[in-house]
Amino acid sequence: MSATLDGSATSELLGNAPVVKSEGRTYPVDIIYGQARQPKERVIDRMVATIKRALEDNPTSSVLAFLPGQGEIRRTADELSNWIHDRKIQGVHLRPLFGNLSIEEQQQAIAPLPGNKEPGKYKNDQKVVLATNIAETSLTIEGVDVVVDSGLVREAKFNPAIGMTGLHTAKISKASSIQRAGRAGRVRPGKCYRLWSADQQQQLAAHSSAEILNADLAPLALQLLQWGVDSPSELSWLDEPPRGAWQQAIDLLSSLGAIKQEAHGWVLTEHGQAMTSLPVHPRLSHLLVCGAARGAIKPAALLASLLSDRDPFSRDHADISHRLDILSGKSNCPSIHQGWLYRTRQLAQQFEQQLFNVKPPGQLAYLITAEQLPGYLLACAYPDRIARRRYSGGYQLANGRSANLVGQQHLAKNTWLAVAEVSSQTGGKGDTIRSAVKLDESLFESALSDAVQQQTIAEWDKKANRFIAEEQQKIGALVLQRTRLDSVPAEAKSAALIQHIRKQGLTLLPWTPALKQWCARVSLLRSIEGGQNWPDTSDEALLATLEEWLAPYLNEVNLLNDFKKLNLAEIIHALVPWEQQQLLNSLAPTHLSVPSGSSICIDYSESPPVLAVKLQEMFGCEQTPTVVAGKVPLLIHLLSPAGRPLQVTQDLAGFWRSSYHDVKKDMKGRYPKHPWPDDPLIAVATRKTKNRM
């Protein structure tokens, strides 16, 4: 197994199998660390400077430099070429190495320089191989004993939310850094220059994350279903497939018609069985089987072979029909590498041969013209990437994403596209369509009718600020046709309105202060009795249970103002039976009679409840008033004649004995018309001035 894998985890999975380590024949490698890279410093600048240093420090050595991707390799090569030209340096040969190169170009990077083929015999010429992680484990590069490592790798990560794989630049693991450094010690002692510090080395993850954690799981899911396994939990894994990616894979296979759900779980359909006989991604096997079912084996094989290989065409040419014309020999493109043409055509022939042994479920209905065929086949493979042009420009995809065509005037004239590849645009400008072909809209009524879904939509229209119900014909997020409905089932309508209320909050409903106080009174009794006998009337609980208490009353709500017409007090009061409402009024009354004879409102929105009353109205009251049968003392806000708080207390007797006299001293001169007796416990409580008593 590879040195970059976690051997202990594999051993544990295999019942604690013994681990045998073979170090191989290696030579010592000196590790030379750099400084931590500054936030605005380009990795290319650091790489170019370090390669120059490595060449000067090791004038008889060739260098292997690890960069994250093709773009960085090309830019690094350009800057080194300028340096070599400006300095008139002789004998330094730059060799890129990445997967998109031809076999001949890759061989130039791997093979020794002419005259340097004998081990241990070096001339003055030096080779600089600028490589992706393709050179980390799988290739042996002759003559290299110096490595310059950027510490970065470009990884393909599948996003199950949108069903697409994107490239992300990440730091390598410790295991990968050791593997890369080891390239310098294959044939003699070497050096490894790392573009990061020793401290940063210690912070790297021990191992790279397993591919299964970031991959498109559709091929795996199809294979497991072929074995009769419809859930990852039925197997033992080093790393269990992520649930989100697995569910996306199942959804994709279902949309391709490869699987169906039965009582005991997911099973392959006859169409899915045919797909499993083709050693390609399920999207392409579906394309091939659909092509065979329409008697279009050759065009389907050609398109599948095109989608299987790296695209050598310029990013400015997204039209797949142009590529197909070149592959089929209908047009010529001298700049396209002949090796790519040969490989792709050979692969197409292999697909044709494999399809002769595949039995499609039957001939499909509806005729398709040769002009419609590429769009149809591509839409079969990528139904989630069917795209429609927006009025504002660009395209919207069936998966809900937006994307643009850059410099594609001919292709951009089409209202509908079948899209094969979409890439993220830097700078937050959305996605870019990299390869696509025009799609005939009439196919949605014929050959692609299975992709069209009928859906009844009941929702709150934000723009119109009203409830709407309509029948929609959709392909994913793309609405083909809308038909307004006069009525929908009450359950669907209430569900839509409840969803809107949850988004906007309970403030949409016609609350009154009295109703808010009623809910607070119920909440108080609920807290005293430990949740027994009384409903939860908190905002959180009411929002969570809208289906139970509000849904039956929403049938007449269509406009925003209709919410205000609801008799919310009656609806909320219905949460408490009549007998309990009488108990509520007794245990948690809305008002309290104070010594002056006034009936003062109790505020239950605070904890404890608050009684705000003028100080003079409480003369003679020694005991703090309570509610809930004496269990909850009220918090007394004693107010000035002007209604401003003078004292807040739950100990009324203690206030009269102590703090009252300080308050009296401060307030008597300010409010001389009101009584300020020396002994408030024997004074007559009043809400009047002294002259009116």
Where in the sequence are the language-model features?
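Active-site proximal loops enriched in glycine and acidic residues that flank catalytic Cys/His/Asp
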Residues: 2-3, 31, 133, 196, ...
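A short, compositionally biased
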Residues: 15, 389-391, 584-588
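Composition- and surface-driven signal marking solvent-exposed, interaction-prone regions
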Residues: 13, 144, 273, 407-410, ...
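Charged, non-catalytic accessory extensions
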Residues: 396-398, 404, 466-693
